[in-house]
Amino acid sequence: MTVPAKVCEASLPGGAVKGLMPERGEEFQEKNAYNFATGGHSSDAVRNWGLGQCLLAGGGVSLKVEYRFLQGGDYTRADVERDARESGSTPLTLGDAGGYLEGPGAHLFVDCPVRPGGDELLEVSVGVGGNGVDVKDRAVRSSAAGLAADAARHVARDIRSCPDAEKLPSGPPRIG
Protein backbone atom coordinates (compact mmCIF):
# COMPACT_ATOMS: atom_id res chain seq x y z
CA MET A 1 0.00 0.00 0.00
CA THR A 2 1.29 3.43 -0.88
CA VAL A 3 1.00 6.15 1.77
CA PRO A 4 1.65 9.69 0.52
CA ALA A 5 4.68 11.60 1.80
CA LYS A 6 2.27 14.14 3.36
CA VAL A 7 -1.19 13.49 4.85
CA CYS A 8 -3.99 15.50 6.47
CA GLU A 9 -4.31 18.17 3.81
CA ALA A 10 -0.57 17.73 3.08
CA SER A 11 0.31 19.16 6.50
CA LEU A 12 1.76 16.12 8.32
CA PRO A 13 4.56 13.73 7.30
CA GLY A 14 3.29 10.32 6.22
CA GLY A 15 6.09 8.28 7.83
CA ALA A 16 4.30 7.42 11.07
CA VAL A 17 1.10 6.71 9.11
CA LYS A 18 2.97 4.21 6.95
CA GLY A 19 4.04 2.40 10.14
CA LEU A 20 0.37 1.97 11.09
CA MET A 21 -0.92 0.72 7.73
CA PRO A 22 -0.60 -2.86 6.47
CA GLU A 23 1.65 -3.52 3.49
CA ARG A 24 -1.27 -4.85 1.45
CA GLY A 25 -4.99 -4.25 1.28
CA GLU A 26 -7.47 -1.71 0.08
CA GLU A 27 -6.08 1.55 -1.23
CA PHE A 28 -5.06 4.33 1.14
CA GLN A 29 -7.65 7.10 1.51
CA GLU A 30 -7.81 10.44 3.27
CA LYS A 31 -11.36 11.36 4.22
CA ASN A 32 -13.01 14.25 5.98
CA ALA A 33 -9.87 16.29 6.66
CA TYR A 34 -10.46 19.83 7.85
CA ASN A 35 -8.57 22.61 9.61
CA PHE A 36 -5.08 21.17 9.07
CA ALA A 37 -3.90 23.08 5.99
CA THR A 38 -3.25 26.76 6.59
CA GLY A 39 -2.72 27.94 3.00
CA GLY A 40 -5.22 30.52 1.82
CA HIS A 41 -6.29 31.48 5.33
CA SER A 42 -5.24 34.53 7.35
CA SER A 43 -3.20 33.84 10.47
CA ASP A 44 -5.99 35.38 12.59
CA ALA A 45 -8.60 33.05 11.07
CA VAL A 46 -6.37 30.00 11.52
CA ARG A 47 -5.61 30.87 15.16
CA ASN A 48 -9.36 30.77 15.88
CA TRP A 49 -9.74 27.18 14.70
CA GLY A 50 -10.73 25.30 17.83
CA LEU A 51 -10.73 21.83 16.37
CA GLY A 52 -9.63 19.83 13.38
CA GLN A 53 -9.87 16.26 12.19
CA CYS A 54 -8.36 13.97 9.61
CA LEU A 55 -9.57 10.44 8.88
CA LEU A 56 -7.17 8.06 7.14
CA ALA A 57 -7.90 4.50 6.04
CA GLY A 58 -6.40 1.63 4.09
CA GLY A 59 -6.06 -2.13 4.20
CA GLY A 60 -8.80 -2.43 6.83
CA VAL A 61 -7.06 -0.03 9.24
CA SER A 62 -8.49 3.36 10.16
CA LEU A 63 -6.76 6.33 11.79
CA LYS A 64 -8.31 9.42 13.29
CA VAL A 65 -6.06 12.41 13.92
CA GLU A 66 -7.77 15.26 15.71
CA TYR A 67 -7.04 18.31 17.78
CA ARG A 68 -9.11 20.56 19.98
CA PHE A 69 -8.46 23.64 22.04
CA LEU A 70 -9.36 23.20 25.71
CA GLN A 71 -10.13 26.30 27.73
CA GLY A 72 -11.89 27.25 30.92
CA GLY A 73 -10.01 24.87 33.20
CA ASP A 74 -12.33 21.90 32.58
CA TYR A 75 -9.31 19.69 31.83
CA THR A 76 -5.93 20.74 33.24
CA ARG A 77 -2.33 19.53 33.39
CA ALA A 78 -3.20 17.84 36.70
CA ASP A 79 -5.92 15.87 34.88
CA VAL A 80 -3.44 14.87 32.16
CA GLU A 81 -0.97 13.63 34.77
CA ARG A 82 -3.72 11.71 36.60
CA ASP A 83 -4.93 10.06 33.38
CA ALA A 84 -1.35 9.15 32.39
CA ARG A 85 -1.05 7.18 35.64
CA GLU A 86 -4.36 5.31 35.22
CA SER A 87 -4.27 1.55 34.78
CA GLY A 88 -3.85 0.78 31.08
CA SER A 89 -2.20 4.14 30.31
CA THR A 90 1.45 4.81 29.55
CA PRO A 91 2.85 8.35 29.99
CA LEU A 92 4.16 10.31 26.97
CA THR A 93 6.53 13.28 27.07
CA LEU A 94 7.45 15.62 24.21
CA GLY A 95 9.52 18.44 25.69
CA ASP A 96 7.11 20.34 27.94
CA ALA A 97 4.09 18.58 26.39
CA GLY A 98 2.68 15.59 28.20
CA GLY A 99 0.11 12.93 27.59
CA TYR A 100 -0.43 9.22 27.47
CA LEU A 101 -0.97 6.13 25.38
CA GLU A 102 -4.27 4.41 26.02
CA GLY A 103 -4.98 1.23 24.05
CA PRO A 104 -3.90 1.88 20.47
CA GLY A 105 -4.37 5.63 20.83
CA ALA A 106 -2.09 8.50 21.77
CA HIS A 107 -3.02 11.79 23.45
CA LEU A 108 -0.65 14.76 23.76
CA PHE A 109 -1.40 18.05 25.52
CA VAL A 110 0.51 21.26 24.81
CA ASP A 111 0.26 24.33 27.02
CA CYS A 112 -1.32 27.02 24.86
CA PRO A 113 -2.33 29.97 27.04
CA VAL A 114 -4.08 32.87 25.35
CA ARG A 115 -2.94 35.26 28.11
CA PRO A 116 -0.08 35.17 30.65
CA GLY A 117 -0.85 32.61 33.34
CA GLY A 118 -3.66 31.01 31.31
CA ASP A 119 -4.29 27.28 31.62
CA GLU A 120 -5.54 26.56 28.10
CA LEU A 121 -4.38 23.30 26.54
CA LEU A 122 -4.14 22.03 22.99
CA GLU A 123 -5.13 18.35 22.86
CA VAL A 124 -3.91 16.25 19.94
CA SER A 125 -5.17 12.67 19.68
CA VAL A 126 -4.52 9.76 17.34
CA GLY A 127 -6.86 6.78 17.36
CA VAL A 128 -6.07 3.51 15.60
CA GLY A 129 -8.64 0.84 14.77
CA GLY A 130 -9.62 -1.82 12.31
CA ASN A 131 -8.78 -5.33 11.23
CA GLY A 132 -5.83 -6.95 12.95
CA VAL A 133 -4.72 -3.92 14.97
CA ASP A 134 -3.00 -5.22 18.10
CA VAL A 135 -3.58 -2.58 20.78
CA LYS A 136 -0.55 -3.81 22.73
CA ASP A 137 1.85 -3.94 19.78
CA ARG A 138 4.88 -1.73 20.50
CA ALA A 139 5.25 -0.66 16.87
CA VAL A 140 1.58 0.41 16.68
CA ARG A 141 1.83 2.36 19.93
CA SER A 142 5.14 3.95 18.90
CA SER A 143 3.82 4.97 15.47
CA ALA A 144 0.62 6.40 17.00
CA ALA A 145 2.72 8.42 19.46
CA GLY A 146 4.98 9.62 16.62
CA LEU A 147 1.99 10.75 14.56
CA ALA A 148 0.56 12.57 17.59
CA ALA A 149 3.91 14.36 18.03
CA ASP A 150 3.97 15.40 14.35
CA ALA A 151 0.41 16.72 14.65
CA ALA A 152 1.12 18.49 17.97
CA ARG A 153 4.10 20.34 16.50
CA HIS A 154 2.14 21.40 13.40
CA VAL A 155 -1.00 22.52 15.23
CA ALA A 156 0.85 24.25 18.10
CA ARG A 157 3.18 26.14 15.73
CA ASP A 158 1.24 26.71 12.53
CA ILE A 159 -2.40 26.83 13.62
CA ARG A 160 -2.74 27.88 17.27
CA SER A 161 0.59 29.78 17.54
CA CYS A 162 1.05 28.49 21.09
CA PRO A 163 3.75 30.23 23.14
CA ASP A 164 6.90 28.09 23.27
CA ALA A 165 5.64 25.81 20.46
CA GLU A 166 9.03 26.15 18.77
CA LYS A 167 10.55 24.43 21.81
CA LEU A 168 8.70 21.18 21.07
CA PRO A 169 11.50 18.81 20.06
CA SER A 170 11.61 16.96 16.76
CA GLY A 171 11.10 13.20 16.72
CA PRO A 172 8.73 10.96 18.64
CA PRO A 173 7.72 11.49 22.26
CA ARG A 174 9.36 9.59 25.10
CA ILE A 175 7.18 6.64 26.10
CA GLY A 176 7.07 5.62 29.75
Where are these regions (language model features)?
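A small/polar (G/S/T-enriched), proline-flanked helix-loop surface module common
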Residues: 1-159, 164-176
